[in-house]
Design a protein with these regions (language model features):
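Structural signature of tandem alpha-helical TPR/SEL1-like repeats
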Residues: 23-33, 58-70, 92-104, 126-138, ...
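A short acidic, Gly/Pro-enriched loop at the edge of an enzyme's catalytic core
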Residues: 332-342
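Class I SAM-dependent methyltransferase SAM/SAH-binding core
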Residues: 280, 286-331
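A short glycine-rich, Lys/Arg-flanked "PGG" loop and its adjoining helix->strand segment in the class I
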Residues: 355-367
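Conserved beta-strand signature within the Rossmann-like core of class I S-adenosyl-L-methionine
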Residues: 368-375
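A short SAM/SAH-binding and catalytic strip from SAM-dependent methyltransferases
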Residues: 340-354
């Protein structure tokens, strides 16, 4: 069976209409359109592929997998069906099969740039920088000089500690466009990671000339000039964690066997076995503490700068409210004597100096309340 008809295609119009309807969120209409297409062509892999995309958009992940696996079964060598399955696997944090499927489709369609983009995205989601670099190099053989591919390659090389090669790529991009802010910032980060802050100073000056007052550029400028700012800018952390939100639990809990939320939750429940308390979870992230606590007889309030992380936490349905603000503002603006427990797990590394944090936490705790926080040990 072929996924695409060689001559007149009796269902092409249906497929195009259904794809548009899915994109607009018109899922009932899309289902009706796909039913019409299937009546004309019962075993067309394209129908099942679109049905999978529709099911995922409707929140039916199981149905999405069933439809996409049916699509692949009908057309095992059809690239688009395989790619959509691989992308779904990656979005659901099933990285091993996602990577295997992505590599398969890359071999089937080595010159397809849409496939290349999907494969690189899967590699990044799975934390496989080496895989991403390999496919980015292949992409640059297909489209030499592509700016976006070079930016991604340089960033991945920097992440792998291959600073010299990363700098070569950044240098080439900046020579081509001296006002390329993404490349300038990339070179700054690479020079800082390579232990050459003084060499990054000129680039931070250029960045601040291009975007005066930018807090992220000002932060890196301070580092390049040998000054450690008291706090990281909120915008920097928001961008970082928005990008990590969908894969955070997979990497921390399953990959790194992260146990701190459970340890703290156990301590809280040991002191409050009836669960009658109010908890303020600062830097709540994807809601791991809430998952370990479960529903409590009181308020569980989550605070995080990342909207995407809060979206993940909301799915657990254990938090009563969320506030998308930074930790310092949350503490400063909260009235006193409200919470039995405040938690701040693995967030102080991002907020920096604690001179304001600890007194404000003490102020809003009830008498005899508990403040659980963690710090990282570092070499002298």
């Amino acid at each position: 069976m072929s996924a695409t008809a060689p001559h007149a295609d009796p269902i092409r119009q249906y497929l195009e209409t259904a794809r548009t309807q899915i994109a607009k969120g018109e899922l009932r209409q899309a289902a009706e359109t796909l039913n019409k297409a299937q009546k004309k062509s019962p075993n067309d892999a394209r129908v099942f592929m679109l049905a999978g995309l529709m099911a995922e958009k409707a929140g039916n992940v199981k149905g999405a997998f069933e439809a996409l696996r049916k699509s692949v079964a009908l057309a095992p060598t059809w690239g688009p069906g395989l790619l959509e399955l691989a992308l779904l696997l990656a979005r659901q944090n099933q990285f091993q099969e996602a990577v295997e499927t992505a590599e398969k489709v890359a071999k089937l369609e080595p010159k397809n740039l849409l496939v290349l983009a999907g494969v690189v995205d899967i590699a990044h989601r799975a934390g496989h920088a080496e895989m991403a670099v390999r496919h980015l190099r292949r992409g640059l053989e297909l489209v030499p000089g592509d700016v976006q591919l070079r930016r991604l390659l340089a960033a991945d090389l920097e992440g792998l500690g291959q600073h010299a090669e990363a700098l070569d790529v950044w240098n080439g991009l900046i020579a081509q466009d001296p006002k390329d802010q993404q490349a300038l910032l990339g070179r700054v980060k690479t020079l800082l990671a390579a232990g050459k802050p003084a060499q990054a100073a000129a680039d931070t000056t250029t960045l601040l000339e291009l975007a005066p007052g930018d807090s992220v550029y000002a932060y890196y400028s301070a580092l390049a000039h040998g000054v450690t700012p008291p706090h990281q800018p909120v915008e920097l952390n928001r961008h970082l964690f928005d990008g990590l939100a969908e894969v955070y639990d997979q990497h921390t809990v399953r990959g790194l066997r992260y146990q701190l939320p459970k340890i703290v939750a156990d301590k809280i429940l040991a002191r409050y076995p009836d669960k009658h308390l109010n908890v303020l979870d600062l830097g709540c992230g994807t809601g791991l503490l809430g998952v370990c606590l479960g529903r409590i007889d009181g308020f569980l309030i989550g605070v995080d700068v990342s909207t995407k992380m809060i979206e993940q936490a909301h799915r657990h349905r254990v938090y009563d409210r969320f506030h998308t603000v930074n930790l310092l503002d949350a503490l400063r603006e909260t009235p006193g004597d409200i919470y039995e427990v405040i938690t701040a797990l693995d967030v102080f590394i991002y907020t920096g100096e604690l001179g304001e944090t600890i007194p404000n936490a003490h102020r809003i705790l009830l008498p005899a309340g508990d403040f659980y926080f963690s710090c990282e040990a570092a070499p002298e």
